[in-house]
């Protein structure tokens, strides 16, 4: 199973890239995390947030591997604990479909894209920088994997 994080945004600071890379490299070969950066649509006076989200939607859809399960990160998504994420990871590994986590741009994700997603989850009730969400998601995926393996990284 391949885990993909499709994230709108590019040119992240080194500390974001290093943090993400640290957790991504800890994952086993059969459960690697791959990052697909999506260049955001430039905001200008003539473009509404809705227009920008629709244009980004097309780029996001192009980045999602065919047949992948889509998990959209959204502030109104379901709260998921680390243990629940581990249970989901186990289910996903058993069905063999790749999983793509989608992090939207500055205005969020297009409403039609969210309707199409297999699941909406949120990382936090707090508003976070999108780069930080990449790091936190990679850490939580590593934690979920460690829970499934009874690895000592996760302590209850």
UniProtKB/Swiss-Prot annotation:
GO MF: rRNA (pseudouridine-N3-)-methyltransferase activity
Highest taxon of the lineage: Bacteria
Reaction(s) the record says it catalyses: pseudouridine(1915) in 23S rRNA + S-adenosyl-L-methionine = N(3)-methylpseudouridine(1915) in 23S rRNA + S-adenosyl-L-homocysteine + H(+)
Pfam family, one: SPOUT_MTase
EC number, as in UniProt: 2.1.1.177
Binding-site list for S-adenosyl-L-methionine: 73, 104, 123-128
Record CDD domains: RlmH-like (cd18081)
Family matches, as Gene3D superfamilies: 3.40.1280.10
UniProt KW keywords: Cytoplasm, Methyltransferase, rRNA processing, S-adenosyl-L-methionine, Transferase
GO annotations of cellular component type: cytoplasm
TM segment ranges: none
Location(s), subcellular: Cytoplasm
Alphabetical list of InterPro entries matching this protein: Alpha/beta_knot_MTases, RlmH-like, tRNA_m1G_MTases_N
Subunit structure as annotated in this protein's UniProt entry: Homodimer.
Similarity section: Belongs to the RNA methyltransferase RlmH family.
Role of this protein: Specifically methylates the pseudouridine at position 1915 (m3Psi1915) in 23S rRNA.
Name recorded for this polypeptide: Ribosomal RNA large subunit methyltransferase H
Species the sequence originates in: Herminiimonas arsenicoxydans
């Amino acid at each position: 199973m391949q885990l993909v994080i499709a994230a709108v945004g590019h040119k992240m600071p080194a500390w974001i890239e290093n943090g993400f890379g640290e957790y991504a490299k800890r994952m086993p070969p059969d459960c690697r995390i791959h990052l697909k950066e999506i260049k955001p649509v430039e905001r200008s006076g003539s473009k509404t947030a809705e227009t920008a989200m629709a244009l980004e939607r097309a780029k996001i859809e192009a980045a999602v591997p065919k047949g992948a399960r889509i998990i959209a990160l959204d502030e109104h998504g379901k709260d998921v604990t680390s243990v629940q994420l581990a249970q989901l990871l186990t289910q996903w590994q058993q069905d063999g479909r790749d999983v793509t986590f989608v992090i939207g741009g500055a205005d969020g994700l297009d409403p039609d894209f969210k309707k199409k997603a297999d699941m909406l989850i949120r990382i936090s009730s707090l508003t976070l920088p999108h780069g930080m969400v990449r790091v936190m998601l990679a850490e939580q995926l590593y934690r979920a994997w460690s829970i499934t393996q009874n690895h000592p990284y996760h302590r209850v």
